[in-house]
C-alpha cells in the first residue's frame, strides 16, 4: 500500500484507473470502516482510502483538537485489507490557501436534524468530499448508513453536480450489544459504555411502535426522548422521517419508506444512530 499526501502524486499514481473505489475517513479506524473497504472492493478496483480530520466540519466548541488520531495503527489495518493507496494529506496539502469557496447543501436537508445542532457541519462535509472526489476521481465511493443524513446529502450533491461517482451505502456495523461502532465511542467512561446501547434500544422501540400501527409520530418521538432523559441522557432529537428526503412523514406514508434518526449526549460524548423502519 502506498501512503500519499500530495494531490499531484496521488493523481499520478491513479492515472489510467477508471474503476477506482474510494472510502473517505477521518481515521481512528474500527471494524465499521474496514467493512466499507470490503464493500468498496466488491464495486471497484483499486480501493483508495483517505484519512483527513477535516477542520471545516467541526464547530468552535467541538472535538477537533482531541479527535483521536491513530495513523500508524490505521495504516496497519488498511494494509491487511489490501488497500491500494492511502491518501493522507496534511491541512496544507488539501487546503494550501484559505478555502474561500464552500459547498452549501440546501437548507431543507442541510439545516435540519444534525444541521440544526451542528451549524456549518454539512457545509464542511460537502466541501471536503467535493475536494477529495476531485483528487481521487473515483468510479464509486462508499459511505456508511450510520451517518444517514450525510449519506443522503453527499449522494444528492454528486447527482446535482453530475460527478461521475456512484455512491454506495454500507450497513451500520454494531457491537454485540447493539451500539453502533463509532470513533467517538472511545470517549465513553465504563458506566457510560454500559448504558450506551440504550440509544439503539429506543430506536427499536420507535420502530416497533410504527410497525404496530402508531401514526402519531410526534408522540412516540417525545416518549423516546423522555425515556432517554430519565436515564441521564441529553437527547437532541429522535425523529421519524421519510427516507427519500428526511421530511416528516404523513399518516399515508408506508412504513418501508421511513427511518428513525437520533442524536443524544451521554456524559461528554455525543452519539448518533438511526434505524430504517
UniProtKB/Swiss-Prot annotation:
GO cellular component terms listed in the entry, alphabetical order: cytosol
Binding sites annotated in the UniProt record for beta-alanine: 57
Molecular function terms from GO: ATP binding; pantoate-beta-alanine ligase activity
UniProt: ATP binding residues: 26-33, 144-147, 173, 181-184
InterPro entries: Cyt_trans-like, Pantoate_ligase, Pantoate_ligase_C, Rossmann-like_a/b/a_fold
Pfam families xref list: Pantoate_ligase
Active site: 33
One Gene Ontology biological process: pantothenate biosynthetic process
Residues the record lists as binding (R)-pantoate: 57, 150
Pathway: Cofactor biosynthesis; (R)-pantothenate biosynthesis; (R)-pantothenate from (R)-pantoate and beta-alanine: step 1/1
Keywords: ATP-binding, Cytoplasm, Ligase, Nucleotide-binding, Pantothenate biosynthesis
Enzyme Commission number(s): 6.3.2.1
Compartments, record wording: Cytoplasm
Keyword Magnesium: no
Description of how the protein assembles with itself and partners: Homodimer.
NCBIfam families, A to Z: cyt_tran_rel, panC
HAMAP family reported for this sequence: PanC (MF_00158)
Other notes: The reaction proceeds by a bi uni uni bi ping pong mechanism.
Similarity-based family: Belongs to the pantothenate synthetase family.
Name of this protein: Pantothenate synthetase
Organism: Paraburkholderia xenovorans (strain LB400)
